[in-house]
Amino acid sequence: MRYTNPDALVSTKWLAEHLSSPNIRMVDATSYMPGQGKDGRSQYNEQHIPGAVYFDINDIADETIPLPHMIPPPEKFASKVRKLGLGNGNKIVVYDANGGFLAAARVWWMFRLYGHTDVCLLDGGLPKWLAEERPIEDTKPAQRDRHFTSRMNNTLVRSVEQVIANIETGKEQVIDARSSGRFKGEEPEPRPSAKVGHIPGSMNLPFNSLMNPKEHFTYRSADEIKAAVDKAGIDLTKPITASCGSGVTACVLAFGLYLIGHENAAVYDGSWSEWGNHPDTPVDQGE
């Protein structure tokens, strides 16, 4: 079995050969959890792939909502990415400092959400790039505003109200990207949470089961991803909504599913940061 959408994932070799292509734009999306003692923007300022701009998921967000990095209104997204020099005609290559789950997949999903489909991930991200001793820089590229049009695809995102309603209808499979311990309610959440456990009826597919943790978090083969999906009991012929802690690693699941042909997996944007503190959300624990 091969990837259905192989162009969504580019290799470090491919990017090195296309660094000077005029229509390609690199985006560094590195982001860290509160308390990790690291800052994505600072790391970008120290070293990044030549020509890359920094995309801050906490800045390009709806700051009126008291939840981490919720999606912004379409006009704000368009305004922010224009100022980064990202436009309609660009092929956008997104990476981060840990292979792809420190927000690179989130940014890939966001561009698709707002209608820009010519976007892909760098497999292995910055760690693989550095391991191969490819060029880096610490200077910001010259940026000029580009024309970017947001056309929001609401089929790719879910609200808490929609996920609550789905518990009754069961129309969509809800897939949780968190660890097994967090899913079962046996491990604490990294962010404040009044509840532990999982959304009733959801299935657990930890995001790292789709990746190679010992190989710079590159994505597994199509056969391996399909096997992990099958083992979790997921039916690829039915609609899927991915969830996680705050809407970041859920996008790893959405991306992995996209690679093997399930192209319209939605992401529950608030994820457990919202569900675990909402007064009206039921919770299950255990398997």
Q: For each of these PLM feature ranges, what is it?
A:
Residues 1-287:
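Cytosolic catalytic domains that perform sulfur/thiol-centered chemistry
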